UniProtKB/Swiss-Prot annotation:
Name of this protein: Phosphoribosyl-ATP pyrophosphatase
UniProt EC number: 3.6.1.31
Coiled-coil region list: none
Record keyword Amino-acid biosynthesis present: yes
GO CC, one annotated term: cytoplasm
Reactions it catalyzes: 1-(5-phospho-beta-D-ribosyl)-ATP + H2O = 1-(5-phospho-beta-D-ribosyl)-5'-AMP + diphosphate + H(+)
Gene name as annotated: hisE
Amino-acid biosynthesis in keyword set: yes
Pathway(s): Amino-acid biosynthesis; L-histidine biosynthesis; L-histidine from 5-phospho-alpha-D-ribose 1-diphosphate: step 2/9
Family annotation (Pfam families): PRA-PH
Length: 113
């Protein structure tokens, strides 16, 4: 996992209320204090903004907005992971587990579980 993601994960973890995160001083601590629904709402908003940026880029707009919105989505996804005591490394591990497996086969295996 990249050093940037490791640092980001550590900062997000430090913003949890149990670790002294102050909702009056930290956006992430505020999200944690508001709970799952606030975090999920932000992810929905960021996902929609990413979709719109991609559509705009396909129509000729600045594709850097795709990058910005994707970064926002990744960031808020990292907050959600931390909310469930998971990390970006857990996602990397899952991707590594799936490596070399057909997407169709992998999805079928999940349905069988």
């Amino acid at each position: 996992m990249s050093e940037t993601l490791k640092r980001l994960s550590a900062v997000i973890e430090s913003r949890k209320p149990a670790n002294g995160g102050d909702p009056d001083k930290s956006y992430v601590a505020r999200l944690f204090s508001k709970g799952d629904d606030a975090i999920l709402k932000k992810i929905g908003e960021e996902a929609t903004e990413l979709v719109m940026a991609a559509k705009d880029a396909r129509a000729g707009a600045d594709k850097s907005k795709v990058l910005y919105e994707c970064a926002d989505l990744w960031f808020h996804s990292a907050v959600l992971l931390a909310q469930f005591d998971l990390t970006p490394q857990d996602v990397v591990n899952e991707l590594a587990r799936r490596e070399g497996i057909s997407g169709i086969e992998e999805k079928a295996a999940r349905k069988a579980d």
